[in-house]
Amino acid sequence: MIDENLIHKALANPFRREILSWLKTPKQCFVQGYGDPGCGVPLNAIHARSRLSQSTVSAHVAVLIEAGLLVSTRVGQWMLLARNEEVIHAFATQISLHL
């Protein structure tokens, strides 16, 4: 079950919405190839694109992960991030049913 309140809070910030948008089309938004596209994009690539401090980006990513909108996978020293399409779809469905 999704926590709609957490998702609303996460989506209230424009930069977090931008991260989700970038991860929707990672090949278009990130110049460097990252191997298996199903694994996600490294956190440092999001940091580099945003030009914000690493701690700021990490804090925003943590909110998206807590809300269930992002999935993180650790591969060695890398933290790879991907959209959680199942949760995003469920949330969009809930919104369309209730509003």
What is the meaning of each model-derived region?
Residues 48, 65-66:
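The C-terminal cap of the DNA-recognition helix in HTH/winged-HTH DNA-binding domains
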Residues 61-62:
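Short, hydrophobic-biased segments on the C-terminal half of alpha helices
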